[in-house]
Design a protein with these regions (language model features):
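Low-complexity, serine/threonine/proline-enriched polar segments
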Residues: 130-174, 586-611
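Conserved, charged catalytic cores of large soluble enzymes
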Residues: 254, 264-269
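Flexible glycine/proline-enriched surface loops and loop-helix/loop-strand junctions
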Residues: 165, 169, 176-181, 255-256, ...
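C-terminal motif of bacterial Sec signal peptides marking the signal peptidase cleavage site
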Residues: 16-18
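Long, charge-dense tracts
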Residues: 249-250
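Intrinsically disordered, low-complexity acidic/Ser/Pro-rich regulatory regions in eukaryotic proteins
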Residues: 227-233
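Bacterial N-terminal signal peptides that target proteins for export
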Residues: 1-9
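C-terminal functional module detector
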Residues: 20-74, 78-81, 85-134, 182-185, ...
Length: 611
């Protein structure tokens, strides 16, 4: 009887341990630097400094990054951001032209840390055999792409759909759907998350380099456009449809035991509810949607997840949790599209017109930030609130730990898959690679590469042929610390670049023209008389004045022009609510040129691209 009692006690203790809530909060301040008093760093500037960084970086803990050869750790990623050299999965060195000011590793919450475990030769879990020794040195070659493509396209999905009886018991006991999956190891998941947290704490250096604990919430909709609210262990739908991905950034040292992932819910509104609950418990976070361009029109809809028209409550709910949006990255620009901005001659800049993770066309309507701005204005006109009053950031979405934001040193983002010019379709394929693609054409995942023939020459024809070097998040903050930079995110004093370190200030207010541009106190007066980018200017009787200050990247090309794009609602005769509209204005020209008062455009200065 004593033996039976002891074993029952052991089972009970194990169940209690396994049921530790992933939403419990842990304080990791003991792992980071000593707390820094606000305003105490040497670079503190009450008029604010400009800081450049990236809030979208993947390492080996992301399932897709590991599948395509990445073994870089979070420590490697932060080393790279601070100017160090790390290796690409194909073996060449990667190093930035100059260090960044802040960085966040944002590995997928979905299956975080599990694929590396599947590849461990000591792992005997049934179903994981195809992953064994995936990233040992002799396997990290371009010849391994067909195998990796098949693992990505089908094997992960089939393993995620697999479940067993004990998994169902754990799910019913904990409410965590991840426990249903037979090959999902919660300990490996939590261990990887702790490694991400530990690394961010180790590399955070107030006044010099800022890190944030963060991860990616990888939600999506089905290809048909219908919403899927939960993972169905009895048979999932298409692996990827309309992209609804977000990066979730924690402000400080207090972090949850687990990230909230798609295995808990695909509904972004459930993520926001989770974030609201954390905020009530003293933990501030924000979510940053990305790649709306690949959302098939579903990132900026006028309905909520359940299909009801959105109103003020939804607008406040979303803005409280998503004050920023990622407007540009390697997978294209989400600013606007030629079909949405036909009068903007640069609306086709770095467009990716397919959905994320697939080759299907992504519907522009509802997929681009500028249209979301206009829809937000219309909703506000209808007294329904504005859920799309975003600040802007850029990012890389690198899956190698290393941002690739310079075309002269572009190594794309998915490791072995797109790490060579041949793989990206930039130069012809050698005969042996052509034969490799042909021989594996029937494998799942073959669509990731494909072939295209010009004359007698073959090129790869991948879905990522439209990708390009990008991008950076830029903030104006008093000092290079978590509190100061996160507060800048909150007030949306941010902007995006496609990779260059352009310095930009923008203010709106009244009587700004009374201040001389050469006045040493220009910025201080601009803050006192107006509001900076991201702020709300309360309407007055007079038209607002704008102050724009821009400086080119010292390592890049000169600036050709400065534009302001006006979004507004215009009432037609008999219409109670205005229709959204936009107008592009050039406001400053290079080379001493003047803006044409009729076209609102700068004259062509004859600048050419040196190819």
């Amino acid at each position: 009887m004593r033996y039976l009692y002891r074993n029952l006690s052991l089972v009970f203790v194990v169940f209690l341990w396994s049921c530790t809530s992933g939403d419990d909060i842990v304080d990791y301040s003991n792992l980071g630097p000593d707390e820094t008093e606000s305003g105490s760093t040497p670079g503190f500037n009450e008029d604010r400094n400009v800081y450049f960084g990236d809030l979208h970086v993947h390492t080996k803990h992301s399932f897709d990054a590991y599948i395509f050869g990445t073994t870089a750790t979070p420590d490697d990623a932060y080393k790279y951001a601070k100017g160090g050299t790390i290796q690409h999965p194909l073996g060449f060195d990667m190093q930035l032209r100059e260090p960044l000011d802040f960085y966040a590793v944002t590995d997928h919450g979905f299956l975080m840390g599990n694929v590396e475990w599947w590849a461990d030769p000591n792992n005997t879990t049934p179903g994981t055999e195809p992953f064994t020794n995936l990233n040992i040195p002799e396997n990290r070659t371009v010849e391994s792409i067909p195998r990796r493509g098949a693992l990505f396209a089908t094997q992960v999905r089939s393993l995620v759909a697999d479940f067993n009886f004990m998994g169902m018991v754990k799910y019913l006991w904990t409410g965590d759907q991840a426990r249903v999956i037979s090959i999902y190891d919660v300990d490996k998941h939590r261990s990887a998350w702790r490694d991400i947290i530990r690394s961010a704490q180790d590399h955070n250096d107030p006044g010099n380099f800022t890190t944030f604990v963060a991860y990616e919430y990888t939600s999506s909709t089905t290809r048909s456009g219908e919403n899927v609210t939960t993972l169905n262990p009895f048979g999932t739908g298409p692996y990827e449809g309309g992209n609804l991905h977000r990066n979730v950034v924690f402000k400080g040292d207090r972090v949850t035991v687990e990230p909230f992932s798609r295995l808990k819910s695909l509904n972004p509104e459930d993520l926001w509810t989770w974030m609201d609950d954390l905020r009530d418990r003293g933990v501030d976070t924000l979510a940053i949607p990305h790649n709306s361009n690949g959302s098939n029109g579903q990132m900026f809809e006028l309905e909520n997840w359940a299909g009801y028209p959105i109103g003020k409550e939804y607008a406040e709910f979303r803005m409280r949790n998503e004050p920023l949006v990622e407007m540009t990255q390697v997978k294209g620009t989400s600013d606007t599209h030629p079909l949405l901005s036909p009068n903007d001659e640069w609306a086709d800049f770095e467009i990716m017109d397919t959905r994320v993770g697939g080759t299907g066309w992504s519907r522009p309507d509802g997929s681009y930030v500028r249209q979301a701005y206009l829809d937000g204005i219309s909703l506000q006109e209808e007294q329904r609130g504005n859920p799309y009053k975003f600040g802007l950031v850029g990012a890389s979405d690198t899956h190698t730990g290393a941002i690739s934001d310079d075309e002269s040193d572009f190594h794309s983002k998915i490791g072995i898959l797109d790490g060579t010019p041949q793989g990206r379709g930039s130069v012809p394929l050698p005969d042996e690679q052509v034969q490799l693609i042909m021989d594996n054409d029937d494998l799942p995942g073959a669509r990731l590469i494909g072939l295209k023939k010009f004359g007698d020459t073959y090129y790869s024809n991948p879905g990522f042929r439209q990708w390009s070097a990008s991008g950076l998040a830029v903030v104006w903050a008093e000092e290079n610390t978590r509190d100061s930079i996160f507060n800048a995110f909150r007030r949306k004093e941010t902007y995006a670049t496609s990779g260059s370190k352009i310095k930009l200030r923008f203010f709106a207010g009244e009587n700004l023209s009374d201040t001389s541009l050469s006045d040493e106190g220009l910025i201080k007066q601009a803050y006192s008389k107006g509001v900076p980018m991201g702020g709300d200017l309360v309407g007055g009787d007079e038209s607002p004045e704008f102050l724009v200050w821009a400086v080119s990247d010292t390592r890049g090309a000169p600036l050709q022009r400065v534009q302001i794009i006006k979004g507004f609602a215009e009432n037609a005769i008999g219409e109670p609510v205005g229709r959204p509209n936009e107008q592009v204005y050039d406001v400053a020209c290079s080379d001493g040129l003047e803006v044409d008062p009729e076209t609102h455009r700068c004259a062509d200065n004859g600048a050419k691209v040196n190819l």
